[in-house]
């Protein structure tokens, strides 16, 4: 049967394996406290759900691929309030069905093998969707390691200039999943300069931009030049709206125009009632502050027990994740399996890339009381 060989090369999505192991433990009657997947367990704010319901009409046709003008305006207004960046909602913003599908398909928009632009650069450990989308699009992929000694930032000086010249797009993700690291504006400025020198695009996945605990992170949109830069963001983590599938791409007018041409062939914007809910979400900050406070309380519970058990937390300045060094040099999957036997699910760092070995990721998605239960388990097991 003619199936893509990429399917075999990539293998099973690692978190599918984690789900299978979790089900086996639950079947034994063990209470499972799931810190494995980054799917917020908090309810979506009532006013957002009301906006969703109010947006449902008797007849709902296909949504416009470019999204409602009001949604593009709400996104542009949020970017200006949050980052001090003025965007043209007609030329520099396009809504998407969350961030995942847009990230996955982006390589199809930017690869140009006839010009030698056949390389996609990503980072690891990290969210695997950009890499997988690039491989399905036929690209070669270069993954830059994010190492603790470099502050979990890519070492751009280690890349051969010949590879930069082949790059169609360079992906970064800050605040970073899984390390929780944030990036200085200087990183984006350097990438934009390299992009101008070597003719590639910079794509910044900023899905965790609003989950921070000290200082609000900067955005790549704040770089002085956006001609070769686009940002992907989403309401999934910011507003606990993972199931709504609502996000956006913003930045380079030329790239946004290319997406306007491409996207009607592969999908559309979110349904109109989801867009109405999204307008409400992007227009409000109160529910986001409340979410940060909840995550902060859960974070404090785990930080306390991990510190008492001398488990070192690395990075973890933002996002909903704690990036924890595995004690005693134990392999990350073995350590995660040991915790799972006691009902605490964490993601082995090796699932997220070779440089993730030696760490595990705690996603702060269980309720605060469940975090306290997990802390008691960790107190006994570690």
Where do the protein language model's features map onto the residues?
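N-terminal small-domain helix-loop-helix segment of the aminotransferase-like
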Residues: 2-98, 105, 281-283, 289, ...
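PLP-dependent enzyme catalytic core of the Aspartate aminotransferase-like
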Residues: 142, 329-330, 334, 341-347, ...
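A short helix->loop->beta-strand "cap" motif at the edges of active sites that frequently abuts
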Residues: 118, 197-201, 226-227
């Amino acid at each position: 049967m003619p199936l893509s060989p990429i399917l075999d090369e990539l293998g099973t999505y690692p978190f599918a394996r984690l789900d299978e192991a979790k089900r086996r433990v639950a079947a034994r009657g063990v209470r499972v406290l799931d810190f494995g997947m980054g799917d917020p367990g908090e309810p979506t704010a009532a006013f957002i759900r009301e906006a969703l319901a109010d947006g449902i009409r008797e007849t709902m046709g296909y949504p416009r691929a470019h999204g409602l003008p009001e949604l593009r305006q709400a996104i542009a207004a949020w970017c200006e309030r949050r980052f001090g960046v003025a965007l043209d909602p007609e030329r520099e913003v396009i809504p998407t069905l969350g961030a995942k599908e847009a990230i996955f398909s982006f390589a199809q928009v930017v690869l140009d093998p006839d010009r030698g632009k056949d390389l996609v650069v990503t980072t690891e450990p990290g969210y695997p969707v950009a890499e997988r989308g690039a491989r399905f699009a036929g690209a070669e992929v270069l993954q830059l390691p994010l190492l603790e000694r470099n502050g979990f930032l890519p070492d751009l000086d280690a890349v051969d200039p010949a590879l930069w010249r082949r790059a169609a797009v360079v992906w970064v993700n800050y605040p970073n999943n899984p390390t929780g690291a944030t990036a200085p504006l200087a990183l984006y400025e350097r990438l934009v300069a390299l992009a101008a020198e070597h003719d590639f695009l910079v794509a910044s996945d900023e899905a965790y931009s609003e989950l921070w605990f000290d200082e609000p992170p900067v955005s790549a949109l704040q770089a002085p030049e956006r001609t070769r830069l686009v940002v992907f963001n989403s309401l999934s983590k910011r507003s606990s709206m993972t199931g709504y599938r609502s996000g956006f791409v913003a930045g380079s007018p030329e790239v946004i125009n290319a997406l306007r041409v491409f996207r009607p062939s592969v999908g559309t914007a979110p349904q109109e009632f989801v867009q109405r809910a999204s307008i409400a979400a992007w227009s409000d900050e109160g529910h986001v502050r409340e979410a940060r406070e909840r995550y902060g309380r859960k974070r404090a519970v785990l930080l306390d027990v991990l510190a008492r058990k001398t488990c070192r937390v690395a990075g973890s300045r933002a996002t909903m994740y704690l990036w924890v060094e595995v004690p005693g040099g134990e392999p990350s999957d073995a350590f995660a399996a040991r915790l799972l036997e006691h009902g605490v699910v964490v993601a082995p760092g090796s699932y997220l890339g070779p440089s993730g070995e030696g760490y595990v990721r705690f996603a702060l998605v269980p309720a605060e009381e469940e975090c306290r239960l997990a802390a008691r388990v960790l107190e006994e097991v570690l």
